[in-house]
Amino acid sequence: SKPMFMCYYDTTQTEHNTITREGQRVMNLIDDQLTITMYVNLLDKSAPAGMPENQMSNLRELKPFLRFKPDTRLKYVYFYDSTDHSRFRGATASLPLREQMLKICDDEDLDPEFFLSPEEIHRQIDLTSEGNRMIYLLERANGRKSFLRFYDGMDIRPRETEITVALKRLVTDASRIVFLTGHGERSLYWNDKGGLYSLIQRNGR
């Protein structure tokens, strides 16, 4: 069913199936068209989670938010390009990108025409700052944009907290963080496990 034609009633005592009040507030602040585009790089080792047969699994994470903005548009773009999260190692990784793509298509019975070439995807969007990994782009009609990342490990999909933070960037101005250096202050790149740099590492950039 299309979200705008669905009714919701959370019967759980703690509203377990409903996003937090903060998440609801953020969704209500988006008063124009919201488009969520999933970019899937076939050469990314996480790509299987973004293939068409898994779209419903990805929608499961977004659906509680779509309840509060049912006119949200969902789009999927499939491409192949170099990535810092490649499926391949060794000799295969040194093959031309198109040959890597064709190998995966042959192994997984996929249509090569389904995937945009690097040149074609570059005309749409530049994802190099994100390592050309699989990612969501959240975009408002007013031009504000925000990336929502997938993660390494067993549980790669963003959850409610990460989704809320990404949506919040569409309705609030980013805070500026300033670091003072040169007077004996602890370095931003201090490597202690409890230091900021360690936290940055653990949170994936």
Model-inferred region functions:
Residues 1-205:
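Short, surface-exposed patches at the edges or C-terminal ends of soluble domains, predominantly
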